[in-house]
């Protein structure tokens, strides 16, 4: 690793630690030329996940997009942002573990609906109304009716 101060390639690692989420290694290094210390971070380079939309378009998987949809559905509900953030991290990990570079958007939508269904029925119906493209009040009624049957 090149020293950011003098440009020397001679240095030694004096400390290594994993990040809180175990996705990065933080290394403290000391330059053997100028004796100054610096920090480097090492992480696995991930290939971007591509989402295949209903119309065949492909987009990069964006956690912010999932977060935005869930936050809209959960607005004014008693659902902690931490629960949403944890779910999004789990979702991304699940998608990575599938081993596919292209994933149908339907898989993500169904996983989000399943999670919201477990958390809060109102948030679930809100999300489902957008995801399933409810056209009128009858679509809401059908979804609510099936929810009530399950209770």
Curated annotation (Swiss-Prot):
A zinc finger (unnamed) spans 3-34. One of its GO terms (molecular function) is DNA binding. Keywords: ATP-binding, DNA-binding, Metal-binding, Nucleotide-binding, Repressor, Transcription, Transcription regulation, Zinc, Zinc-finger. GO terms for biological process: negative regulation of DNA-templated transcription. PROSITE patterns: ATP_CONE (PS51161). Signal peptide: none annotated. Pfam families: ATP-cone (PF03477), Zn_ribbon_NrdR (PF22811). It comes from the Bacteria. Disulfide bonds: none annotated. Binds 1 zinc ion. Residues 49-139 form the ATP-cone domain. Its cofactor is Zn(2+). Belongs to the NrdR family. Negatively regulates transcription of bacterial ribonucleotide reductase nrd genes and operons by binding to NrdR-boxes. This is Transcriptional repressor NrdR. It comes from Desulfosudis oleivorans (strain DSM 6200 / JCM 39069 / Hxd3) (Desulfococcus oleovorans).
